[in-house]
Design a protein with these regions (language model features):
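Bacterial Sec-dependent N-terminal signal peptides
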Residues: 2-44
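Glycoside hydrolase catalytic-domain context in secreted enzymes
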Residues: 41-392
Length: 395
């Protein structure tokens, strides 16, 4: 009798435990399905929202483009001052303001010369150079760095930050190696992506430079670089590829040097083929300052905005740049039909897209300047770089 009672109790207990476990399992499965469905729906909604936003932006761009005169379109393709390009006031299109540099926002420069303006409120955080950042081997810290410098650029009302620089070290004698992320294409590729995302979350475009093969400063405006396709794709381009495909950079700066006999700021292979076609880059190509040498090549080979000093200083400051390569001479070539207006329209679409992403984005934050958080990021970068370098030296 006792054995039967014990067996009955044991069976009831086992059934209860099984039932509870079964109930819990069913509940977990149900919740999992619900959560998966909710999460999937969130992803769908997010994707749909992004698609709607994209379609709205592109629709606005086409509407604006249809209202612009030929002269207005061309005016957006060149500078109006040392660090800005014009907008179209009658259509509510603002100017684009740019600034150096990769490790600190440059003090204000005069409108039409390279003298400093003497402002007293343009102080910033001086961050360690990008070589130091790269030496931390810390992508999260790279994102903090980019976010901080993006906040300072935004506070100073800059729309395009002229950086980061990711040219690969080819020679230790390059005077700007300190600005770049090292000699390792893989490391530079890993570190540049979070930097770009940090900058651009502030509604400020990262302008990744110098595209491409700008690996020495001596005679940089004239030197003709010759490298094999293998070296080009395996050493000199991977960091730029990561910047475009993973970092989704909004702008790229062409370099001063030539590559296989053609200047890189209007290079058919680098800009039209590799960057805009193979990599599907939808942003703006900006020349290095004074890096443009031909109206036809600039128009046909992928340059969108020509920057630099005015060729003609005799006219009023606001029209001094009309004499530059993508100014009046470009306008005349389009008017004559020698250059198809569709080529001009593609440039203007890209510029308008950049403006939509930056200065016309009403949701972008106001920015911050020279605060304790930025100083802490700068100090952490310097500390981690020195510590890691010291440890590696004693391995």
């Amino acid at each position: 009798m006792i054995n039967k009672l014990s067996l009955l109790l044991f069976s009831m207990l086992r059934y209860t435990l099984f039932y509870r476990r079964f109930s819990i399992a069913v509940s977990i499965l149900f919740l999992s399905c619900c959560c998966t469905r909710i999460y999937s729906q969130q992803l769908i909604n997010s994707s749909s929202s992004d698609q709607v936003r994209l379609e709205t932006t592109e629709s606005k761009i086409e509407s604006i483009l249809s209202l612009m005169t030929l002269k207005e379109k061309v005016s957006m393709c060149h500078a109006q001052s040392q660090f800005s390009s014009p907008g179209i006031p009658r259509l509510g299109i603002p100017e684009l303001w740019m600034s150096d540099g990769p490790h600190g926002i440059r003090a204000e420069i005069n409108w039409s010369n390279w003298d400093y303006s003497g402002w007293t409120n343009d102080y910033i955080t001086a961050f360690p150079a990008l070589t130091c950042l790269s030496a931390t081997f810390n992508p999260d810290l790279s994102n903090q760095y980019g976010t901080s410098i993006g906040e300072e650029a935004r506070y100073r009302k800059k729309d395009v930050l002229l950086g980061p620089g990711i040219n690969i070290y080819r020679t230790p004698l390059n005077g700007r190696n300190f600005e770049y992320m090292g000699e390792d294409p893989y490391l530079a590729s890993i570190m540049v992506v979070p930097y770009i995302k940090g900058v651009q979350m502030n509604g400020v475009a990262a302008c990744v430079k110098h595209f491409a093969l700008n690996n020495q400063e001596l005679w940089r405006g004239h030197i003709n670089v010759e490298v094999s396709d293998r070296a080009l794709y395996e050493i000199y381009l991977p960091a730029f590829y990561a910047a475009v495909k993973q970092g989704e950079a909004w702008s790229i700066m062409g370099s001063y040097n030539q590559f296989r006999g053609q200047h890189c700021s209007h290079h058919k292979l680098l800009l039209n083929k590799i960057l805009k076609t193979d990599w599907s880059f939808d942003g703006v190509v900006i020349s290095d300052w004074g890096g443009t040498h031909s109206t036809k090549e600039a128009a046909l080979n992928g340059l969108d905005i020509e920057m630099g000093s005015p060729i003609n200083n005799e006219t009023s400051p606001r029209h001094a740049y009309d004499a530059n390569f993508l100014g009046t001479s470009f306008l005349e070539l389009v008017k004559s039909g020698e250059i198809d207006e569709r080529i001009l329209n593609d440039k203007v679409r890209r510029i308008l897209r950049l403006i939509m992403r930056t200065t016309l984005d009403s949701s972008r934050p106001l920015g911050k300047i020279n605060n304790i958080e930025h100083s802490q990021v700068a100090r952490k970068v310097a500390t981690e770089a020195v510590s890691y370098t010291h440890l590696r030296a004693h391995e």
